[in-house]
Amino acid sequence: MMWRRWLALALVAVAWVHAEEQVRSKSKICANVFCGAGRECAVTEKGEPTCLCIEQCKPHKRPVCGSNGKTYLNHCELHRDACLTGSKIQVDYDGHCKEKKSVSPSASPVVCYQSNRDELRRRIIQWLEAEIIPDGWFSKGSNYSEILDKYFKNFDNGDSRLDSSEFLKFVEQNETAINITTYADQENNKLLRGLCVDALIELSDENADWKLSFQEFLKCLNPSFNPPEKKCALEDETYADGAETEVDCNRCVCACGNWVCTAMTCDGKNQKGAQTQAEEEMTRYVQELQKHQETAEKSKRVSTKEI
């Protein structure tokens, strides 16, 4: 029994030394390489330096408002988003983006961007990992999978599936995890949490029933799983997360691979008939956008299979 522990310690020591050597090697190769904001130096398989978008920013909280009207957790997240989307985003001012007083034709819908979704997911994983208890000499601990199983059973209503309301109740167990404050208005932030929970469910909902089995739940919150960067499709063009387009006085935003639009009455009238007609027109338009998106994704899957 003792020799197994010594062997395990030896393997850990070897892995640690190897990791230290890799860090020193990377530091040496990247010593004189400047990558610019939102990018970091990495070493290729050939041992050459290259600049890539930052994989993960440090989670320190210093909100800034970007020139695109989005609030970011810190400067690093803003520049990382600019790098990933290939767009030019500058810091407009420190702090959360200010809420517009009046509703104007350019008002945007409340949406959960991929950066919001990934930040919520990161916080949940960090919270769950903090509950891991290693096995002791005379006691059994709790691993990551067992902790997830405990929460899954606690919030499942008995159908062996977590829907969005059950998932949201699970997330609300941790105050840090739900404290996403992109908007100045608290009601919008509450709506944002629900939208981001839906976005998390969509990540691993393999049968598209908007409910997660335990295996889907496990995949969604697997620390080694990297959520894909999804884009929106429209008229044979693809748009990055955060891209916007206008239809009359309404604005549509690309968020987590889906188009989300406002439903405003463009002639300024508040009559019920006009409002209903405007909403119906926007519903049809959003459906058209989603059809374009589904067609593009199907074409992509077919192309992948052919390759």
From Swiss-Prot:
Molecular function as annotated in GO: calcium ion binding; heparin binding
GO biological process, one term: regulation of BMP signaling pathway
Superkingdom of this protein's organism: Eukaryota
Major localization class: secreted
Residue ranges annotated for the VWFC domain, each copy included: 232-286
Signal peptide segment: 1-19
EF-hand domain segment(s): 143-177, 192-227
Kazal-like domain mapped to chain residues: 47-99
All residue ranges annotated as the Follistatin-like domain in the record: 29-52
UniProt keyword Disulfide bond present: yes
Keyword ATP-binding on entry: no
InterPro entries in the record: EF-hand-dom_pair (IPR011992), EF-hand_FSTL1 (IPR057020), EF_hand_dom (IPR002048), Fol_N (IPR003645), Follistatin/Osteonectin_EGF (IPR015369), Kazal_dom (IPR002350), Kazal_dom_sf (IPR036058), Prot_Inhib_GrowthFact_Antg (IPR050653)
CDD domains linked: EFh_SPARC_FSTL1 (cd16233), KAZAL_FS (cd00104)
Function: Secreted glycoprotein that is involved in various physiological processes, such as angiogenesis, regulation of the immune response, cell proliferation and differentiation. Plays a role in the development of the central nervous system, skeletal system, lungs, and ureter. Promotes endothelial cell survival, migration and differentiation into network structures in an AKT-dependent manner. Also promotes survival of cardiac myocytes. Initiates various signaling cascades by activating different receptors on the cell surface such as DIP2A, TLR4 or BMP receptors.
Protein name, UniProt field: Follistatin-related protein 1
